[in-house]
């Protein structure tokens, strides 16, 4: 999956080079990845077994969506969930490595975003109106981890501790991290 992501990232750079960078946020890179790999036949350069193409296509398409369609089941759902976990773990490590991605502001977090977070739900990017809410959105991604292995990795590598260390206003985000740490530990021991 990482190989596909690297290839898609390179093709994505080529694709958007002709556009204003403000367009980048409006392009769904999961859908673009599917288009680049399958519509242009690039998949043949990486993988030959056409029996797996639909699983690969769905995994790439849904790795960055807020959820996977309910009617995707069996091996196709497992492949989607593996890709989603891998993508989120990469994002968490990127947030730790590049501290400037966790930028804060002086705004309060809206009631809707707060409620969604404390109900252990993913937050839709369209509902985000501030840098602080973007941090909460990033934290809510932990709710969409699908495998015990992924939760164990989060706990063993102390990802939450490292992210909390990067936050400047620890008091503002303390309850979010405490709640999330409790949820992650529970899921790590129960899955």
Show where each model-derived region lies.
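Histidine- and acidic-residue-rich, metal-dependent catalytic cores
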Residues: 25-70, 75-81, 85-89
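Divalent metal-dependent phosphate-bond-processing catalytic cores, especially two-metal-ion Mg2+/Mn2+ enzymes
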Residues: 3-4, 8-19, 24, 65-66, ...
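Extended cationic-aromatic binding surfaces that line active-site or macromolecule-binding grooves
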Residues: 1-14, 31-43
């Amino acid at each position: 999956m990482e190989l596909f992501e690297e290839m898609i990232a390179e093709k994505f750079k080529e694709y958007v080079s002709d556009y204003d960078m403000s367009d980048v946020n409006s392009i769904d890179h999961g859908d673009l990845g599917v288009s680049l790999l399958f519509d242009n036949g690039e998949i043949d350069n990486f993988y030959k077994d056409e029996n797996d193409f639909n699983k690969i296509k769905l995994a790439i398409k849904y790795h960055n969506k807020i959820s996977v369609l309910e009617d995707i089941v069996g091996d196709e759902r497992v492949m989607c969930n593996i890709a989603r976990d891998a993508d989120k773990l990469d994002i968490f490590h990127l947030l730790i490595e590049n501290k400037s991605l966790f930028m804060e502001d002086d705004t309060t977090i809206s009631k809707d975003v707060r409620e969604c977070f404390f109900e252990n739900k993913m937050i839709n990017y369209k509902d985000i109106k501030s840098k602080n809410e973007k941090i909460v959105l990033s934290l809510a991604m932990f709710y969409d981890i699908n495998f015990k292995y992924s939760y164990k990795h989060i706990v063993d590598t102390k990802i939450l501790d490292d992210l909390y260390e990067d936050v400047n206003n620890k008091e503002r985000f303390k309850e979010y991290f405490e709640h999330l740490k409790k949820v992650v530990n529970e899921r790590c021991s129960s899955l």
